[in-house]
Amino acid sequence: MSILSALTSISNPMKSTKSSVANGGGRLSMGTNSVACGSCGGGNSSSGTINNADGSQTTYYSYTSPVYTYNYSYSYSSSGSSSCGCH
């Protein structure tokens, strides 16, 4: 009788300056500090903004079905797995 153990190795997140996300069997690479996500349904367009200290605004994401584009760096594990937060 044996006991099978699954060991999960978790390493420190690494900062990404060029984002890529899994896209089916391949990988979808975008420009620096952006990430493309698959469709979350609907045909809407939206965007999110940050209010800067000087009163200006910075758009940090935009959505036009079926692609989200995020305008910031994000961290991911060394395994390269990441998700786009479509719920």
Swiss-Prot record:
In this entry, which stretches build a coiled coil? none
Q: Identify the InterPro entries for this entry.
A: HssA/B-like_chaperone, HssA/B-related
Report the superkingdom from the record. Answer: Eukaryota
A biological process from GO: sorocarp development
Compositional bias annotation for Polar residues: 1-22
Q: Matching Pfam families, A to Z? A: Coiled
Which intervals of the chain are annotated as region Disordered?
Answer: 1-23
* Family listed: Belongs to the hssA/B family.
This protein is called what?
A: HssA/B-like protein 7
